[in-house]
Swiss-Prot record:
Part of a disulfide cross-linked outer membrane complex (COMC) composed of the major outer membrane porin (MOMP), the small cysteine-rich protein (OmcA) and the large cysteine-rich periplasmic protein (OmcB). It comes from Chlamydia trachomatis serovar D (strain ATCC VR-885 / DSM 19411 / UW-3/Cx). This is Major outer membrane porin, serovar D. The keyword Lipid metabolism does not apply. In elementary bodies (EBs, the infectious stage, which is able to survive outside the host cell) provides the structural integrity of the outer envelope through disulfide cross-links with the small cysteine-rich protein and the large cysteine-rich periplasmic protein. It has been described in publications as the Sarkosyl-insoluble COMC (Chlamydia outer membrane complex), and serves as the functional equivalent of peptidoglycan. Permits diffusion of specific solutes through the outer membrane. It comes from the Bacteria. GO terms for cellular component: cell outer membrane; pore complex. Its main location: membrane. Pfam families: Chlam_OMP.
Amino acid sequence: MKKLLKSVLVFAALSSASSLQALPVGNPAEPSLMIDGILWEGFGGDPCDPCATWCDAISMRVGYYGDFVFDRVLKTDVNKEFQMGAKPTTDTGNSAAPSTLTARENPAYGRHMQDAEMFTNAACMALNIWDRFDVFCTLGATSGYLKGNSASFNLVGLFGDNENQKTVKAESVPNMSFDQSVVELYTDTTFAWSVGARAALWECGCATLGASFQYAQSKPKVEELNVLCNAAEFTINKPKGYVGKEFPLDLTAGTDAATGTKDASIDYHEWQASLALSYRLNMFTPYIGVKWSRASFDADTIRIAQPKSATAIFDTTTLNPTIAGAGDVKTGAEGQLGDTMQIVSLQLNKMKSRKSCGIAVGTTIVDADKYAVTVETRLIDERAAHVNAQFRF
């Protein structure tokens, strides 16, 4: 049985190192791996010993914490209906732009994100009790990247308006939704923190069964937003938008004269519980674990308008192409720009974990019972790699 357990754990550790595929699980034996310190000798006494003191029971560890999520499995968390203009039904020619909101099927409902990445570098500090329990925290910086179908971001615009673009009515609302395009965003590097606890619950020889609980939080701002759409392609650096505002947006939306906007930021929260099993083989302690986690990315459903000129140049305020090729720049003529997209905007919808359960495999290398380096990979609910290097005082 011991040989089988060793084989399984060693295979898992080697597999993780060869295929680096949020929050790490960590080695369940970590509280008891480093039993000696670089400044003070470790204490191997019995917690029930009446002569033992808290000074004997407590120790500190510090080190580096690196967590790199290459693909988090996320989906949108939105309502089934979305308020916008009625869907166009005119066979030919233009029509008056809609001015009333209609409940339509939300194209963002249940959408899966194509890519979600997050990279964190931090310092970690752990308070150890009786070489069995850890209470730890991390303080550092994180940055992220999100990519998805334009429908996931409710990219909409007005099409077929019979008015000249210079005189779009203030009450006009979008009537077209885009689902054949891509939206991606990059966040800045911002402060991130996490707290957690880990305990070695059961030990038998070289095997250790442990559990942990962690919580992490960060709020990065959106550094760059790219909309890759044939009908309305644009890029915004440090985008701003409207929070809690229904259509129609102000006619100044997307211009430098816009008011009532705020910076686009994403409020990231995640908590995780895990259970793992390890087996010590001299310097190496491979482990395998399962985890259950929930992550959310909330941008307050901020709506961001396409950038445009505050005043018309050649009777246009954007460089959106014509759809039917019938557009013409002609002052005062009705419908001449009816086949170009008007008042284009998108919103950053709330996202959450699409899968809650995952597995983690890794190994820890311990030197002189004072220093340790852990390498881990996580699969199923995310593809991620984790590196942790620490020493005990």
